[in-house]
Structure formats: C-alpha cells, structure tokens
Amino acid sequence: ASALLSGVLTKAGIFGALIITADILPGEHRWGVLLLVLGAVTMVLGAAIAVFSNNLKYILACSSLSQIGFILVGTAALSLLGQHNALAAHGTVLYMMNHSLVKLTLFLLAGVVYCNTHALDLNQIRGYGRGKPLLHGLFLCGACSLAGIPGFLGYISKTLVHESLVELAAESGSLGVTAVEWLFLFSGGLTAAYLTKIYVALFWQKPISPTGKTWGTPMTVTALVLAALPLPVLGLLPHGLAEPVAALALPFVGGHPFGHAVHYLAWENLKGVAISLTIGMAVYFLFIRLVLMDRKGAEAVYLERWPRWLSLEERVYRPVIRGLYRVLNVVMRAVCDALDFLVLVARRTFLRDSRPRRHRSPRSAMIHAMTHGGQRTEQEAADRLGTILDTLRRMEGSLSYALLMACLGLCIVLVCILLYVF
C-alpha cells in the first residue's frame, strides 16, 4: 500500500499541476513562480526531516515529500521557460517515472525488512541486509537512482531539471531562480545523506541478532527485480530509451522536443551531481555521524534530534484536519436543521396531509396490465417478477458486480481522456 501511495497516487496532484500548467494557465508567470516557491520549500523541508528521522518508513515518506518538491520545481521551469522548455519537460516526465520506480523498490524493500524483523527503527533493524547480496544490489539500484548517480535514470532526470533551472536563471537574470537552483543542489545533497544513513545502518552495521540468509519469497524477489531493473537500463540508454519514453508525454505536458542532443556525461552536467554528492557526504560525516549518532558500546545508536514542537504532523496536519472536521460538522448540522425546518413549514402550509386514497403501486399496476386482470395469472406474474427483482438485488450487492461497475467506470474515464488528448 505504501509503495502504491508513494509511487502512484502522489502523482495525481502532479498530473493536476501539469494540466493547469499546460492547458489552463499556459505561460502564466505568476503560476510558474508559485510552483517554484512551493517546490523549493517542499524539497528542502522533506529532505531535512528525512535526515533527522530514524524510522525507515518515515524517512521514505519524507523523501517522497521532498521528491514531489523536485518535480514541482521542474513543472515550474516548464511553465516559465515557454517555448524553450524541452529540458524541463523531458526532465519532469522522467523524474516522475524515476520516483515511481524508486519508491516502488524502496518501499517493497522496507516491507521485506518489516515482515522479517517486525521493526522499522534503524537501531533495531541495523545489519539486516548483511550477507544478502541480491537485497544489497536492489537497494543500491533504488538509492543510487534517487541520489542521481550517473548510470541510473535518476541522474538523467535530475540533470535535465537542474539544467532547465540554469537556463531559466540565465534567461531571466533573477537571483531568486539562482537561489532555487542552489536549494535544488542542497536538497540533492540531503537526499544522498539520508540514503547513506539507511544504507550504512542496513548493510554495514552489525545486526542485533542473526538474521539468516532467506529474506523473501520468489514472488517478492521478482517484484523487486522488476521494479529496480528499469532504473539502470534507462539510465544507461538515455538517448535510445529514456528520451523516447519522455517524448510520448510531451503533448500532455505542453513540452517541446530537443533542438540538439544532450551530452549527459559532459562536465557541465556532471558538475551539478558532484556538488550535491559533496554536500551529501559532508552532511553525513559532519552532521549525522557527529550530531545524530551516539556511540554506546561497539555500535553507534541513532538519536532523535528533531524538535517535537516542529513536528508537521502534530503542529499542522492534525490541527488542520480537526479544524476542518469541526467547521464541516457545524455547516452540515446547519444544513440538516434547515432542511428539517423547510419540510416542517411545507407540511403545515401547502403540503398538508390529504385524505388517503386507494393507490396501486407501480409493480402491481404493471402486473395488472401484463395479465389483463386475471387473478391467477397475476399471482404467477408477481412470483416471476419477484424472483427477477430478487436476483437483480443479489447481483447488485455482490463484489463481482461492484468490480464490474468499477472497471466499466474506469473504461469510460479512459475513453474520455483518450478522446480529449487525441
């Protein structure tokens, strides 16, 4: 469920932002600036919370928050660059694809760890991956791609989005865009730092107790391999695979094709990821190991240093949800009371009770008309109709009927989208 939420459902909001950018507010400067600011704040805040956290699943969740910020920054560049948005368009589409595949891999891996250890705290699951080379390799595929290491899809997508910010800064001459570019690199460094934290804890520290060699069923291993394998394949074939895949979505996002080939391994493109990785290693060795870890005995213990008063969940999300619940409760109660009052007024004025009249139900009338009034025939028709209606009611209440209706609805939505796009 977490893999689907992070990898698939979070893209629903991004699709909405892309539709607004491409179709509703194309070229709108204020909309692009709003996305740029929101994306910058989101990518830094999510990555910072992930650095402080010790819970594997919470780190990955905050990482998703940060990665959505990266995608929003790419969407903002796509909007602000107008006709010159080829880098931003390709980068945003590939970033979405990379994030979905990476989080599918890492959340499935977190599920494997939890199912075998029944814990998610790094202090309790440390060393679980030691002696498991396939699990080690699958984690590295996801982590390296998310950190933007060359040879993986994440490097291609992150490079394109970063270079679109460089192009936007040069075109606009805005110090604000330059600041966002450096926040982009800094957030990339934080991404590398918290991924290194997970990697060292899972695969290099000594385990609390022996974990064994077996860690998943053949189906689990197959799912992880299928999720992780496209990351290096697309990363090693950017011109042959990654760019053509991104080009399929260009009409949807309002993007333009490349005017020239992109040299991904040129120093100008490698410089961005080199800066991010340098920042990441500095944060890991100078902050995480010195401030967020404490040596107790032979092994280091991860500490919770994030202030409780800065908890987004406790300070923002829960109060907002409680406030919305109370406001909507008052509104709905007022609407309900108003309807009751209107019904009462109507029954005492122009909708007073009339004298009872003999009334034949639609079902009885239909049976009477079908049988021309014959008593015995009416009884047989009533029994037959009752059987049909009972069968229909049982069908409507079954799970298969609900799934059939859901599939029919999805097909209708898909046809409408295809007709709209093509």
Predicted segments with their positions:
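Hydrophobic alpha-helical transmembrane segments
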Residues: 176-188, 261-283
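Hydrophobic transmembrane alpha-helices and their helix-loop junctions in integral membrane proteins
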Residues: 1-216, 230, 236
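Hydrophobic cores of alpha-helical transmembrane segments in multi-pass integral membrane proteins
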Residues: 188-190, 231, 276-282, 411-418
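Loop-to-transmembrane helix boundary motifs in multi-pass membrane proteins
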Residues: 130-134, 212-229, 399-409
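Aromatic-capped, Gly/Pro-kinked transmembrane alpha-helices
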Residues: 5, 241-273, 291-422
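Transmembrane alpha-helical segments in integral membrane proteins
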Residues: 188-204, 277-297
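Alpha-helical transmembrane segments and their membrane-interface junctions
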Residues: 145-161, 228-249, 334, 412-420
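Hydrophobic membrane-spanning alpha-helices of multi-pass integral membrane proteins
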Residues: 12, 39, 142, 220-235, ...
